[in-house]
C-alpha cells in the first residue's frame, strides 16, 4: 500500500471505527494494570501500537531488544528514536549466547505486571489460534498479563495507520522477508528462518543474504 492509498483508506468509517475501538481498549487495559511496558521492535505493528498507547500514557516504559552486531542490519536506529521524540526507552542488549541459555533465571526479575505486544491474528494460523483461545487481555501462569490491542488489525489497516500518522520504523523491516513477524530478524534456537525466504533473498539481494549467513553460518543454504 502506498501513502496516497493509505490516506484515502483512512477516511473510511470502518477503519476509523477500528482505531477508536482499539484506542478505547487500550484506555480500558491501562486502567486495569499497575506497571505495564510496551514490547517494541519499531517495526510497523509495534510502531502503530506504540503510537496509540502513547496518546493515553506518554510515560509508559518501552522495552527494545537489541542484538549484538545488529547494526549490520539496522543503520537508522538513532534517527528513528529521535523522530519519535522523548521516550521512556529501555534498550536490552542480548547475544547468541543469551538466546541459547537454558537457565530458568536467565531473564532478570522485574516489577512489571503486564506488557503490550503487537500480535495480530492475520500473521499466522498459530497466532490466530492463540489470540482467539486466550483473548487479547491474558494472564499467563507467571501472573503476567499480555495485552494485544492489534489482534484484529489487518496488514492494510496497520499500513494505513503508519502512513497516515507518518510513523518512523527501522529500515530492517523494509527489507523483503522482514516485514512480517513470522520471518524474524532474530532467529530462535533452531534458527528458524524459512528456507524459502533465504533462497529468495539469496537470488534477489545477495548482500543482505551474506550479512545474515555471516552472522548465522548454520543457516547457509
Question: Could you say what each language-model-derived stretch is?
Answer:
Residues 1-221:
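Nucleotide-activated chemistry modules centered on ATP-dependent adenylation/adenylyltransferase
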Amino acid at each position: 500500500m502506498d501513502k496516497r492509498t493509505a490516506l484515502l483508506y483512512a477516511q473510511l468509517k470502518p477503519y476509523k471505527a477500528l482505531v477508536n475501538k482499539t484506542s478505547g481498549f487500550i484506555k480500558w487495559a491501562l486502567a486495569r494494570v499497575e506497571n505495564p511496558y510496551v514490547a517494541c521492535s519499531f517495526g510497523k505493528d509495534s510502531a502503530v501500537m506504540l503510537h496509540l498507547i502513547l496518546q493515553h500514557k506518554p510515560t509508559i516504559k518501552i522495552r527494545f531488544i537489541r542484538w549484538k552486531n545488529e547494526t549490520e542490519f539496522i543503520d537508522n536506529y538513532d534517527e528513528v528514536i529521535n523522530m519519535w521524540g522523548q521516550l521512556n526507552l529501555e534498550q536490552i542488549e542480548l547475544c547468541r549466547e543469551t538466546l541459547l541459555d537454558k537457565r530458568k533465571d536467565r531473564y532478570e526479575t522485574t516489577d512489571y505486571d503486564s506488557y503490550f505486544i503487537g500480535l495480530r491474528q492475520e500473521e499466522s494460523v498459530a497466532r490466530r489460534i492463540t489470540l482467539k483461545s486466550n483473548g487479547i487481555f491474558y494472564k499467563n501462569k507467571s501472573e503476567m498479563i499480555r495485552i494485544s490491542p492489534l489482534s484484529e488489525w489487518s496488514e492494510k489497516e496497520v499500513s494505513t495507520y503508519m502512513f497516515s500518522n507518518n510513523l518512523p520504523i527501522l529500515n530492517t523491516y523494509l527489507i523483503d522477508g522482514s516485514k512480517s513477524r513470522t520471518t524474524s530478524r532474530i532467529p530462535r534456537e533452531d534458527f528458524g528462518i524459512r528456507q524459502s525466504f533465504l533462497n529468495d533473498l539469496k537470488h534477489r539481494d545477495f548482500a543482505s543474504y551474506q550479512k545474515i549467513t555471516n552472522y548465522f553460518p548454520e543457516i547457509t543454504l
